[in-house]
């Protein structure tokens, strides 16, 4: 399951930018952020395309190759459900048509006025802002995109996460670590005498 939403950030030069973020709920892996002056149906599609391209790069094949096929109908079944709120970009015909063209994806929207149903994504934006964006001045969209990407790399590859047993999201996402089994460095301390 992917959790997807938009967040806003105002730069020091006065521009307000929208950051689209998609995170894998199970592994906590953050896909690349899409930064734009708008948060419309085109931006939503661009963000999903970025995530699909990142998936293909990580796993060496497109996501659709992992889809099971219904043996009775021959229909390709989705392997990822994208969870969004009820914002305009996600209710648009164009976004729904895009999802329909990708049999590997399904889309559900949370209940109206229920941000907690997409709370992991909301919390992810809070962490991005407080750990990376609010600590110094960001002049423009280019700097915003650079800081967001720096955060994403650190978040996915460097720091361990309590929610996935102190493993790193990229390792869990690639199946190199179990999100239920801690991956601590065990240092054996032997007696010196």
Model-derived regions: residue spans:
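Short, conserved catalytic/metal-binding motifs centered on acidic residues
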Residues: 5, 28, 85, 118, ...
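Short hydrophobic alpha-helix segments
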Residues: 33-34
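C-terminal domain-tail junction helix/linker
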Residues: 78, 96, 100-103, 127-193
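RNase H-like polynucleotidyl transferase catalytic core
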Residues: 81-86, 100-120, 135-140
């Amino acid at each position: 399951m992917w959790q997807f939403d938009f967040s806003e950030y105002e730069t020091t030069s006065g521009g307000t930018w929208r950051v689209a973020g998609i995170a894998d709920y199970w592994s906590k892996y953050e896909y690349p952020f899409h930064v734009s002056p708008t948060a419309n149906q085109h931006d939503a599609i661009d963000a999903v395309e970025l995530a699909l391209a990142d998936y293909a790069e990580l796993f060496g094949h497109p996501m659709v190759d992992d889809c099971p096929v219904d043996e009775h109908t021959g229909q390709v079944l989705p392997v990822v459900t994208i969870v969004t709120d009820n914002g305009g970009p996600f209710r648009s015909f164009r976004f729904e048509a895009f999802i329909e063209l990708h049999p590997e994806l399904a889309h559900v929207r949370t209940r109206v006025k229920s941000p907690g149903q997409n709370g992991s994504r909301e919390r992810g934006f809070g962490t991005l802002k407080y750990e990376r964006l609010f600590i110094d001045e960001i002049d423009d969209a280019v700097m915003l995109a650079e800081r967001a990407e720096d955060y994403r790399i650190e978040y996915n590859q460097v720091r361990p996460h309590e929610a996935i047993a102190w493993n790193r999201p990229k390792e869990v996402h690639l199946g190199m670590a179990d999100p239920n089994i801690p991956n601590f460095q065990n240092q054996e301390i032997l007696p010196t005498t």
